[in-house]
A protein has these predicted regions:
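Active-site loops and adjacent core secondary-structure elements that bind or stabilize anionic groups
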Residues: 1-7, 11-174, 179, 183-184, ...
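C-terminal accessory domains/tails appended to large, multi-domain proteins
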Residues: 124-313
Length: 313
């Protein structure tokens, strides 16, 4: 078991497929099959023949064949999910810990330093953003967090969430399942597990959103307070951050191992951070100059060429 660091909350959560299915964002499932978001609306259609026929008819004649293909894909996916419904194969691990920012780094529980990259061009917010801006500065310097003049809510200014989720191989897998079909569906379950776990953390464990009442569509549209950037996201592009996450979470607790380049196995795994600041938002780091690359490599204690490889994953 991982060491329980002081002033932190560590949890391992296990879910059945049945519990996680409602949180699946079908848009990304169909995207993996090369289909536009409008075809994902089949997931919202009543299962009666009349409603399904009306859905097909809502498309142009040129697109109705593709709509039927989408319906078939969805039906096959639902059948597999029913087969796996009672299997507890969706697992998550999370840590809520005291944190403070120091420059473009976040120090977790005073012992693990996580360096981040900063935008070098002003974004939509009017700032050059870095994820460390959403955590209170050690000396309460004039950073983005202090400029917002927002009082801490349940210590959201000095707390960071770290998480990982994974989906293990279903026992009731049919030999006829295509590898790509299994891969895309378990990928969606891993993301859905992260969605469900994040909701529980906001409402019950971190507790800063106890009264949150959002529909599934609102959850998928990220209408909640806070963000959950995953490793590999545009604001967190360095895959080697997984090694620091492993140091904090001990990913093997839920069956995840890391390759030498920081990739997770099983492939249907998600890892990242949770920020609760009311003004936290997603952004893209974009291009960085050689000066920041050199500084970041120094803070990550790696060679520049090595960092370039992690950023190119």
């Amino acid at each position: 078991m991982p060491q329980r660091i002081h002033n932190s909350e560590f949890r391992i959560l296990h879910y059945s497929v049945r519990e996680v299915v409602p949180y699946i964002n079908w848009i990304y499932y169909f995207h993996a099959w090369g289909m536009e978001p409008r075809f994902a609306t089949i997931a919202d259609v009543h299962n009666c023949p009349s409603c399904r026929a009306s859905w097909i008819a809502s498309f142009s004649l040129e697109e109705q064949a593709k709509a039927r293909e989408a319906m078939k894909l969805y039906d096959e996916a639902i059948e597999l999910l029913r087969l796996w419904a009672d299997e507890t194969i969706c697992h998550g691990v999370s840590l809520l810990a005291y944190a403070y920012s120091e420059g473009d780094d976040i120090i977790v529980d005073g012992r693990v330093r996580i360096p981040f990259l900063r935008q070098q061009h002003v974004g939509k917010s009017g700032y050059t953003m870095c994820l460390s801006d959403f955590i209170k500065n050690k000396n309460d310097n004039d950073n983005f967090s202090s400029q917002l003049n927002s009082p801490p809510i349940n210590d959201i200014a000095n707390t960071i969430g770290i998480f990982a989720t994974t989906v293990l191989q279903p026992k009731n897998s049919q030999s006829s399942i295509f590898d790509f079909q299994l891969s895309t569906l378990t990928d969606r379950l891993a993301e859905a597990t992260a969605e469900k776990m994040h909701e529980e953390i906001r409402k019950h464990y971190w507790g800063y959103a106890k009264d949150e009442q959002l529909t599934m569509s609102e959850l998928h549209a990220e209408k909640f307070q806070g963000i959950r950037p995953a490793v590999g996201y545009p604001s967190l592009p360095d895959q080697s951050i997984n090694f620091l996450i492993d140091e904090l979470l001990h990913l093997s607790e839920i069956g995840i191992t890391l390759s030498e380049n920081g990739a997770m196995n099983p492939h249907c795994s998600v890892s990242g951070l949770m920020f609760a600041h009311p003004k936290a938002h997603y952004f893209s780091i974009g291009e960085i100059g050689d000066d920041q690359l050199k500084d970041y490599a120094h803070r990550r204690k790696m060679e520049i060429e090595q960092i370039k490889k992690f950023l190119a994953q």
